[in-house]
Structure formats: C-alpha cells, structure tokens
C-alpha cells in the first residue's frame, strides 16, 4: 500500500481470523494463521510508529527514499529504494522484494499507486470489487493513468472469474 492510504484510512492490513466464514476457519485453524508482510511505499516518511499498520502482529516493511530517524518497533523495517522519474522506483522495489523471496504481492491502494503499478507493467492480475453505485465525472477513478485517453492505449485484461459478493461484483482479471 502507499503512505497516502495509511494516512487516509489507518488500515491494519491483517488477516482477521474472527471475520472469516466458518468454512474458512475450519480449513485454517487460528493457531496456523500467518500474517502477511505489509509493505508501505512511504517516499516522504509520512507514516509514524503510531499508525495501526505498525502496531499489528507481523512485520511491516517501509520502502523509502531516505532513512527515518524516529524510534520504530523491531517489527518495522526500512528498505531504501532510489528515485526514478521523481518517484520511488517501483520496478526496483519489486526486484528487491523478489531477492527476499517475496514473489507474490497483493496491493491495496488508491488510484495513484494502482495507476503507477499498471504503467510500470508490474500488474499481471487484478481483483476489482464493483458496488452497484455510480459517481459523477469529478469522482476519483480506479487508476490514475495520465495520458491514457484512447482504448488503443489501454492495458488489456481477460476475465478469469466474475462473481457476486453480497451486493457487489468481484472481477478477477489477468493480463491478456
């Protein structure tokens, strides 16, 4: 996720066993639950040790342009990643994560990070939830993709699965 998401939502980004269905709980006993490594892209060092993401069980990795002088718990690590075109180098970040045997990355992010990952060619699968609600043209879009104005420029995906989840629809897409 990005620091913008952490600042806006203060998410935990944890697996909450008690919120899983009874069938899923039966498959995965609570004592076997493993929390994911949370990776936060925080190029301006805006996230603090007081945010919920840092206070959860499991490890949090901060991808940053420079070190942060604050006192952090042992569960928080920093990975320094150089800048590319004015932003943290996302391609290099993924390569560095791969060197740590992190080969699958789930991203929960807003339009800016989602768009940057798409533009960098780092997305091979999308899971998109769509609510049966419409917003106007001034609302924030799913992905910030500046300069993409014609269908011929659009990234191509194929549908793997379409299912209803409560009142919403879940689209599972992979690159075409």
Indicate where each model-derived feature is located:
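Flexible, gly/pro- and Lys/Arg-enriched active-site loops
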Residues: 119-157
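Active-site ligand-binding patch in enzyme domains
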Residues: 1-103, 112-115
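Short, flexible micro-motifs
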Residues: 5, 45, 112-115, 139-144, ...
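Conserved histidine-centered catalytic loops in small-molecule metabolism enzymes
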Residues: 146-176
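Structured beta->alpha junctions
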Residues: 82-85, 132, 163
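A generic "binding-loop/recognition-motif" signal
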Residues: 110-113, 122
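Short, loop-centered acidic/histidine patches that primarily coordinate divalent metals
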Residues: 110, 129-132, 165
């Amino acid at each position: 996720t990005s620091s913008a998401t952490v600042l806006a939502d203060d998410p935990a980004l944890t697996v909450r066993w008690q919120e899983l269905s009874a069938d899923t709980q039966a498959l995965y006993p609570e004592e076997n639950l493993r929390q994911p490594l949370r990776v936060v892209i925080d190029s301006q060092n805006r996230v603090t040790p007081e945010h919920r993401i840092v206070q959860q069980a499991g490890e949090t990795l901060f991808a940053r342009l420079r070190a942060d002088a604050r006192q952090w718990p042992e569960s928080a690590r920093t990975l320094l990643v150089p800048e590319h075109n004015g932003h943290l180098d996302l391609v290099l970040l993924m390569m560095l994560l791969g060197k740590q045997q992190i080969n699958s990355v789930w991203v929960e992010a807003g339009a800016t990070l989602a768009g940057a990952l798409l533009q960098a060619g780092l997305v091979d699968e999308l899971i998109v939830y769509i609510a049966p609600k419409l917003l106007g043209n001034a609302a924030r879009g799913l992905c910030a993709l500046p300069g993409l104005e014609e269908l011929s420029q659009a990234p191509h995906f194929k549908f793997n699965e379409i299912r209803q989840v409560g009142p919403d629809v879940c689209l599972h897409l992979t690159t075409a």
